[in-house]
Amino acid sequence: PASSILHALAHDLPRCGGMVHQAEDEIAAVGAMLGAYFGGTPSFTVTSGPGFSLKQEFLGYAQMAELPGVVVDVQRAGPSTGMPTKTEQSDLEIAVHGRHGQNAAIVLSVANVSDCFYAPHVARYLAETLRTPITILSDFHVANSFGVVNEMRSCQLDDVADIATDVLERFDLQPLAVAPLIHPNQAAPGHSPDMRRITGLNTDSEGSISYRAETAQQAHATRVAKLDAVRDALAVPTIHGDTAAGVLLCGWGSSRGALYEAVDELAAAGVRIAGMHFHTVFPLPQALTSVLHGYDQVFTVEQAYGDARHPGPFAALLRQETACDVRTLVGQATGRPLTPGTIVDAVKEGAHG
């Protein structure tokens, strides 16, 4: 389903002075994207299914070498070839923790057509500020959707620091306060007569290869600090529905429409319930833990498998990050988009269960 992005950009990007490169395979594509960024050209690559798995080694390399980059993964039903023309939200775990070693990634998601326009700008801002690859999770449902939208804000930037605050706020973000780097003493290539060293080996602040224990520990601490910089800039997503309800339904990505409509339908029927939708799915806001612990029950609605014994990927992530007893209310892995009726029925069944 990532082909829809390729088709659109092949038509439109050359008009804006850009170019589209269709590489021979997924590994070459992500390598070309990182090489372009190293040369000073903002770039991104798109993929789906097993192609996202093939990109993981280069994404780990980019984290170690502090190369910016943006990857859009249009999720489909899996694993393996699975159902290429069906939708799912089952790549969350690989997006966050898919590379070997200890290096969680920053992950954004899109809920609708408008988000697809703005998400790459936010991802570019994060990637260039923190010098790290950013993943945007879409899915087949969004990638093949059409919608009438308001006029888009132009986000052509010479300097990502000039990104509009309201664009960041779509993803619950404020401008980053700090930009921790492993190699603060290295110049960008082409901007200095100094040598710019780049490697996947562990290095010190000058870019020199180092096997020293304290250097390795500091590099890990800096990578974690990049996550914390995003975490500290994140606001808890706005509550939709009854702010005094004891039950909270959480979703992310393309589940927003069905989630909000279900909450509204339940409220009209006298059910006190609230909804929360996440655009930034990792890291999560610092204040989220206390918010979730303020509810009697917290559930997720996901287009990924989950049941009473096996929490869905997003429920598992919320548990891991907040130590809150989050359970999966709807864990739908049918290949079909979530509907409000599915969520409403699950809430009613739970109330009588």
Language model segments and positions:
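Thiamine diphosphate
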Residues: P1-A105, S109-V110, G341-G353
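Flexible loop/turn segments at secondary-structure boundaries
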Residues: P1-I5, A28-V30, F52-K55, A77-T81, ...
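Flexible, low-complexity linker and terminal segments
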Residues: R124-G353
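Structured ligand/cofactor/substrate-binding pocket environments in proteins
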Residues: L67, D115, A123
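Structured loops at beta-to-helix junctions and adjacent beta-edge loops in soluble globular domains
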Residues: V110-A111, D139
